[in-house]
Amino acid sequence: MSRVTLSRYLIEQTRSHNTPADLRFLIEVVARACKEISHAVSKGALGGVLGSMGTENVQGEVQKKLDVMSNEILLEANEWAGNLAGMASEEMDHPYQIPGRYPKGAYLLVFDPLDGSSNIDVNVSVGTIFSVLRCPNEYLNQNDTLREEAFLQPGTTQVAAGYAIYGPQTMLMLTLGNGVKGFTLDRELGSFVLTHDNISVPESTAEFAINMSNQRHWEAPVKRYVEELLAGKEGPLGKNYNMRWIASMVADVHRILTRGGVFMYPRDAREPEKPGKLRLMYEANPMSFIIEQAGGAATNGTQRILDIKPENLHQRVAVFLGSKQEVERITGYHAE
């Protein structure tokens, strides 16, 4: 039986679910860029890509060399293809304008080029997160500068989302709004091959992911929930839980997507003016779309993440996502 490559899968989606051809091509271009990033990540010190650039991004975070390289790879791969009206990156202050020498398309691409890049130098799994939106008609004029407002759509409007994880294997997890598929990069073939079909997050779990060192800064509902988890079989939840924390959202969410669990990155008292740490557009929305399509849930503690209307490109948000039963429990604690 022949293996199903990403290209074949996307063609079959065009036939069975009327996936537009330009969206199919866009996903393939993003996947090719992810293969190039994977190659750069795997070379590590041999490629001279480790270490800091000595600059900061719009988030005030120190940029790693691979942050900048990954960002450039995604921009250069996608700017010429004619599928996009514009792009937005976690590493850039403003939307990226498609150069006038290239045709424009009907979609917007939003991405975190290298999530978890602080782990690069210690050889921990990192990844690329991306989200695809339709560009509103009023912003499609070929001659106008694309404004930030075109991107400020709730997560429910996403037409596709995915992430690539660069670990022992390079994998691409993808949703087009009809479930989640997992593809593994076959380096001999040079293609992503379907290896995980119809991924489903278990409703309940015995694992959780959170940075426990921040416990003293959490809000009361989060403290209560985690204390109940730690109480184990003798506590109110009646079972023992294991904690896992990699400090790379892609790696933590990938584990939860494949074997269940709950990922938590709550707001805390150190920066009370900020509603959270993670970026809504670049991280929370695409990951929430993927998790929901796999049968899980995602909230900011009080509201479904995909229902949040962004106010700016770099808006932050608290995140609780994963197994539905656990996410509903902690969301309920916030409501009390």
From Swiss-Prot:
InterPro entries: FBPase_C_dom, FBPase_class-1, FBPase_N, FBPtase. It is found in: Cytoplasm. Mg(2+) 2 binds at D112, D115, E283. Substrate binds at D115, G116, S117, S118, N211, K277. One of its GO terms (cellular component) is cytosol. CDD domains: FBPase. One of its GO terms (biological process) is fructose 6-phosphate metabolic process. Keywords: Carbohydrate metabolism, Cytoplasm, Hydrolase, Magnesium, Metal-binding. It is an enzyme of class 3 (hydrolase). GO terms for molecular function: fructose 1,6-bisphosphate 1-phosphatase activity; magnesium ion binding. Binds 2 magnesium ions per subunit. It catalyses: beta-D-fructose 1,6-bisphosphate + H2O = beta-D-fructose 6-phosphate + phosphate. It comes from the Bacteria. Its cofactor is Mg(2+). Mg(2+) 1 binds at E90, D112, L114. Pathway: Carbohydrate biosynthesis; gluconeogenesis. Its EC number is 3.1.3.11. The keyword Isomerase does not apply. HAMAP family: FBPase_class1. Belongs to the FBPase class 1 family. Homotetramer. This is Fructose-1,6-bisphosphatase class 1. The lineage of its organism: Bacteria, Pseudomonadati, Pseudomonadota, Gammaproteobacteria, Pseudomonadales. The gene is fbp.
